[in-house]
Amino acid sequence: MVILFQLALLLLVVMSFVLIVGVPVLYATNGDRVQSNRLILVGGLAWTALVVLVGVLNYFVV
């Protein structure tokens, strides 16, 4: 269970860095706005799910 918690936490940190860099880049590009907004929404939802998962796993680990 500890390894699963550590992997989820690592994934959360990596996803946070990707979103910190990716969101401004996607907003600054002149590409397809609908696809960019969808990508940002999916990234935000995945990040939120990871926060909840880390919280639940933290309850079981500690």
From Swiss-Prot:
Gene Ontology biological process terms in this record: photosynthesis; photosystem II stabilization
Protein name: Photosystem II reaction center protein Z
InterPro entries tied to this protein: PSII_PsbZ, PSII_PsbZ_sf
Keywords from the named record: Membrane, Photosynthesis, Photosystem II, Reaction center, Thylakoid, Transmembrane, Transmembrane helix
Designated gene of the protein: psbZ
Assembly and interaction partners: PSII is composed of 1 copy each of membrane proteins PsbA, PsbB, PsbC, PsbD, PsbE, PsbF, PsbH, PsbI, PsbJ, PsbK, PsbL, PsbM, PsbT, PsbX, PsbY, PsbZ, Psb30/Ycf12, peripheral proteins PsbO, CyanoQ (PsbQ), PsbU, PsbV and a large number of cofactors. It forms dimeric complexes.
Cellular component aspect of the GO annotation: photosystem II reaction center; plasma membrane-derived thylakoid membrane
Organism: Synechococcus elongatus (strain ATCC 33912 / PCC 7942 / FACHB-805) (Anacystis nidulans R2)
Function: May control the interaction of photosystem II (PSII) cores with the light-harvesting antenna, regulates electron flow through the 2 photosystem reaction centers. PSII is a light-driven water plastoquinone oxidoreductase, using light energy to abstract electrons from H(2)O, generating a proton gradient subsequently used for ATP formation.
Subcellular location: Cellular thylakoid membrane
Span of the signal peptide: none
Family: Belongs to the PsbZ family.
Membrane topology qualifier: Multi-pass membrane protein
Transmembrane segments: 8-28, 41-61
